């Protein structure tokens, strides 16, 4: 949590939560303990869940995600649109953010159908009160791609942790 004083307002660290971790009865106490141990404000942590992780036991997943949400951490649907996309999941689970997979983002300038899908996903997320993030690895082409995204979509850059600390310190 050394980076928190340097981080811009609203900056969060996102961690993938595996299906096994989501099903683990100790995941909520573990997240609570980890936040306290590292002095990390809950709103600075985002937990990312793939849609497939929700399928094994939706009842347990719903309870666990609700408890994690109550801690104040952000809950994101990771790689939205590439797996078992069910609109019912968006209604049933306490998600804060939809992350549009880089498969779509990388093709947004080349394919009108892909651009239409991204606009549709953004509109759906907006109607449900969810943030939308577009995934792309940090690179020279990132800004060009993000310029083509609909308004309201936040870039979600994949950064190396050492690079992140270096950027924050500057």
Where are the regions a protein language model picked out?
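The catalytic core of metal-dependent phosphodiesterases that act on cyclic dinucleotides
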Residues: 29-108, 112, 122-140, 147
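Conserved protein-kinase N-lobe ATP-binding Lys motif
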Residues: 19
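Catalytic core regions of nucleotide second-messenger enzymes
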Residues: 5-11, 39
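Conserved N-terminal phosphate-binding loop of PLP-dependent enzymes in the Aspartate aminotransferase
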Residues: 117
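Alpha-helical scaffold within the catalytic cores of cyclic-nucleotide enzymes
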Residues: 1-6, 122
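N-terminal low-complexity segments that are often proline-rich with Ser/Thr-Pro
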Residues: 134-170
